[in-house]
């Protein structure tokens, strides 16, 4: 009898607690759904939906994909979409956010020799010497891909050619010496950057 009375007393309290927990979780759930919907809009090039989502919650611009960990900025960089890149930057997209492998939008641009995109990212203070999980910088990736125009741009913006990776303990300069028989990349690396090296510690929207 005592147990039955006790249960009758506790049950309503338990229901209230569960309800309160669900209520507390709902904002986080709503943000997750909103972020995923925003990334889908970016992937589908739906400027209207993306803009509306950011009007509701401006922080969604830096949402990371639940599986890949990449942001909208990485998505549009990989498809070499300068219009969307400028739009996202104007909305406060953070170019330093990396995916699960530590790859940043600037690194994607370096691999693709997407110079226009890299320039936009660097103008937005993308860390030029940030490393991925292998310890590779954007400059190392550009040298490995033999993307001369990208090497020139990164060096111009103060990239450190002597920063070694974790995998082989080699720097961009080392890779250039080993792999570039023409000497072109090494010459670009030895060129002086414009101005002081970067501190690493009205825009049109998409149509």
Indicate where each model-derived feature is located.
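Ankyrin-repeat-protein effector appendages
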Residues: 2, 26-40, 157, 167-170, ...
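Bacterial N-terminal signal peptides
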Residues: 11-22
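Start-of-repeat signature of ankyrin repeats
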Residues: 34, 68-69, 102, 135, ...
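Ankyrin repeat A-helix N-terminal signature
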Residues: 40-45, 75-81, 108-114, 141-147, ...
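Ankyrin repeat structural motif
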Residues: 47-54, 81-89, 114-123, 147-155, ...
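Ankyrin repeat boundary/linker residues
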Residues: 65-66, 99, 132, 165-166
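Alpha-helical adaptor scaffolds
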Residues: 70, 77-86, 90-91, 97-125, ...
